[in-house]
Amino acid sequence: MSDMKKVTLVLSDGTKFHGKSFGYDAPVAGEVVFNTAMMGYPESLTDPSYAGQLMTLTFPLVGNYGVPPFTFEENGLPTFMESDKIYASAIIVNDYSEQYSHWNAVESLADWLKREKVPGITGIDTRELTKVLREHGVMMGKILFDDEPDNIPEANYEGVNFVDQVSCKEIIRYNEGAGKKVVLVDCGVKANIIRCLINRGVEVIRVPWNYDYTDTDFDGLFLANGPGDPDMCEDAVNIIRKQISQSRKPICGICMGNQLLSKAAGATIYKLKYGHRSHNQPVRMVGTNNCYITSQNHGYAVDAKTLGNDWEELFVNMNDGSNEGIRHKVNPWFSSQFHPEACSGPVDTEFMFDKFVETLK
């Protein structure tokens, strides 16, 4: 620990937290957010939804099970990660464990961060930082090295189309010839979403976020997760509107997909004070007493009161009452704000994939 450089996290309101660098030694700026999950840092770091963000982990000890190998399955999906690289701009922890032990680990978290050129800081009171963000809302911040001048520009999060940065640039097919065809709109899709569809025997046609698929031959539409503000994705929303105006084909959405489908249904989106990023968010299925523990990662939410008359809420968050999913009253169109594929987190709601695939038949 003695050879780690001293760094300071400076929030946009001037609040400072002092720590040490254990990742790539470079200053960085971004939106500071917090995640209260106890595990899953390899999956979270490679989740494209964290693009542009400095990810704070509230669990005090991080790194003690190392990092799994970057291997790929026959279908081209990463075996243990959620994409092919780290998307978070930095990771902020309280106590980084230099020693790691796990049957599947091949390197330390520090070595992985350095190889991918991603900063990491330790020694921060992450729970105090979380209290600040919870009280004042998420804010922009910088990680600066104490012996270097502040010479990096301020970062922007609002008004940036992160989806365009992380989406695929060409069509990718999985499980070709398997049967029913699903067009998956890639806003920053996690690998396990594709895996959950493949495992249910469908062919997945992964298309860029602004690709017009309305004249394509397919059986169902899947709207994937992704980073940033859904209001930056008007092209995707307009294509969804076009699709639902001309076809009753099944539609399912997750996270950003819930927001884009809601916008196509006439709803407005607002930014949450500090977002939902954890493995233990309770949601209730509307019209039932069924409550599920879910994995979540989003900073924006749907204003359910603004949904069109043909739509209704499907899930509601039990902590703050915010929307967690919508459905059409007649057609097989539904979505969830949470992540039924988890990875990491609970798999209580994986039945959402079953329901979607059943509607394809």
Show where each model-derived region lies.
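RNA-binding accessory domains that recognize and position tRNA/RNA substrates
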Residues: 2-210, 230, 238, 343, ...
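Residue-level detector of beta-strand face positions
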Residues: 8, 282-284, 314, 325
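Proline-centered loop/turn at the N-terminus of a beta-strand
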Residues: 119, 181, 250-252, 268, ...
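Active-site-proximal beta-strand elements of phosphoester/diester hydrolases
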Residues: 181-186, 294-295, 334-338
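Short acidic/histidine-rich motifs immediately flanking catalytic phosphotransfer sites
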Residues: 216-221
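Cysteine-nucleophile active-site neighborhood
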Residues: 225-304, 345-355, 359
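Catalytic beta-strand/loop cores that center a nucleophilic Ser/Cys/Thr
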Residues: 290-331
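A glycine-centered loop/beta-turn motif at secondary-structure junctions
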Residues: 325-361
